[in-house]
Amino acid sequence: MNSIRNFFKTFLLVELVKGLMVTGRYFFARKITVQFPEEKTPISPRFRGLHAQRRYANGEERCIACKLCEAVCPAMAISIESEQREDGTRRTSRYDIDLTKCIFCGFCEEACPVDAIVETHIFEYHGEKRGDLYYTKPMLLAIGDKYEAEIAANKAADAKYR
């Protein structure tokens, strides 16, 4: 009896028809493709994109050169050099992030005691050469200055979860 059933399943191509029914169901279903450059999907408030360095309201940079972000970075993408000022405080003389190494884990942002380094919502950046993805301190400060309002709003919205 089993051999007769297997013969009819094979002869009538039951498995093929079942597969085509599944394909047909998805063929006529509503499409969910997003046409990327024109349409954009919403971004989570906790999205980790391009890095930025922040300043205080008086214009002074926030980074105190504690080097916690450099120490906690698992990809070793951050390199910092610091120097003493005349008033005895320590500030960065060089702060570089190599985005070809960075894995955007957010550890640097979590480790920073003064919220100097943050990750923005910017994900549309590119480089023609490898060196274009090597961000220096002036570049990071410029990004922070440009997007400070958005960064502050995201920090305030996320404050109760930190």
From Swiss-Prot:
It comes from the Bacteria. One of its GO terms (cellular component) is plasma membrane. Residues 53-83, 93-122 form the 4Fe-4S ferredoxin-type domain. Its main location: membrane. It holds the Pfam family Fer4_7. Binds 2 [4Fe-4S] clusters per subunit. It is a peripheral membrane protein. It catalyses: a quinone + NADH + 5 H(+)(in) = a quinol + NAD(+) + 4 H(+)(out). Gene3D superfamilies: 3.30.70.3270. Its cofactor is [4Fe-4S] cluster. [4Fe-4S] cluster 2 binds at residues 73, 102, 105, 108. [4Fe-4S] cluster 1 binds at residues 63, 66, 69, 112. SUPFAM superfamilies: 4Fe-4S ferredoxins (SSF54862). GO terms for molecular function: 4 iron, 4 sulfur cluster binding; iron ion binding; NADH:ubiquinone reductase (non-electrogenic) activity; quinone binding. Its EC number is 7.1.1.-. It is found in: Cell inner membrane. GO terms for biological process: aerobic respiration. Keywords: 4Fe-4S, Cell inner membrane, Cell membrane, Iron, Iron-sulfur, Membrane, Metal-binding, NAD, Quinone, Repeat, Translocase, Ubiquinone. Belongs to the complex I 23 kDa subunit family. NDH-1 is composed of 14 different subunits. Subunits NuoA, H, J, K, L, M, N constitute the membrane sector of the complex. NCBIfam families: NuoI, PRK05888.1-4, PRK05888.1-5. NDH-1 shuttles electrons from NADH, via FMN and iron-sulfur (Fe-S) centers, to quinones in the respiratory chain. The immediate electron acceptor for the enzyme in this species is believed to be ubiquinone. Couples the redox reaction to proton translocation (for every two electrons transferred, four hydrogen ions are translocated across the cytoplasmic membrane), and thus conserves the redox energy in a proton gradient. This is NADH-quinone oxidoreductase subunit I.
